[in-house]
Amino acid sequence: MKNLILLFLLISIINLIQSLPLDSVINFYVNSTVGSCKGKQLEVSLDVCNNGCSNSFKITSSKDNVNNYNFTSYIETDDKQCLTNNYTINLFNCSIDNAALVGPYSVKCIFKETPSPSNSSNPSPSPNTTSSSSLSSSSLNSNEPNQTTKPPKTNEPQKNNSTSNIPNFFAIFGFLVLIIFILGDKI
């Protein structure tokens, strides 16, 4: 019986550690088809907020050799929670010819606190939190002819399946079992 309770306690501690507000990862898929993009800049907007927030990633690229593009994204947001979800995003400002850039890619959001204004009742237009992230791709095909088409900028986030706001009932249950176990020994 004691071993079972200790097992519950161990699992509860692991769950609580995983639920701590550490660096989060956003996984997303690039489902757009990309052709030759020589001399052009790839940009992607990705909504990372739960409830209609307008903050988004802006991902730009720089070509390091014939077929490899390095992507770097930056985000500024007043939402301290970096969601962990799968999103569908579209590339634009580049020819949409050939299935060449695929995912998923992981974006690590590192949040850094900045001093809040003295008057907290008035919301500040500047973000209270910032983060930066980077990712890379080595699967961009540069054999297609260069085009100048510019599709409209679009965001297509998938259904939000985040459970970060749901209480960890299993961890709470484990601690309750531990308390009962301690009180039972004293009685």
From Swiss-Prot:
Lipidation (GPI-like-anchor amidated asparagine): N161
Membrane topology of the entry: Lipid-anchor; GPI-anchor
Glycosylation site positions: N31, N70, N86, N93, N119, N128, N146, N160, N161
GO cellular component: plasma membrane; side of membrane
Signal sequence, start to end: 1-19
Manganese listed as a keyword: no
Residue ranges the record assigns to the propeptide: 162-187
One function term, GO molecular function aspect: actin binding
Biased composition (Polar residues): 147-161
Subcellular location: Cell membrane
Region of interest (Disordered), residue spans: 115-161
Function noted in UniProt: Binds F-actin and nucleates actin assembly.
Protein name: Ponticulin-like protein K
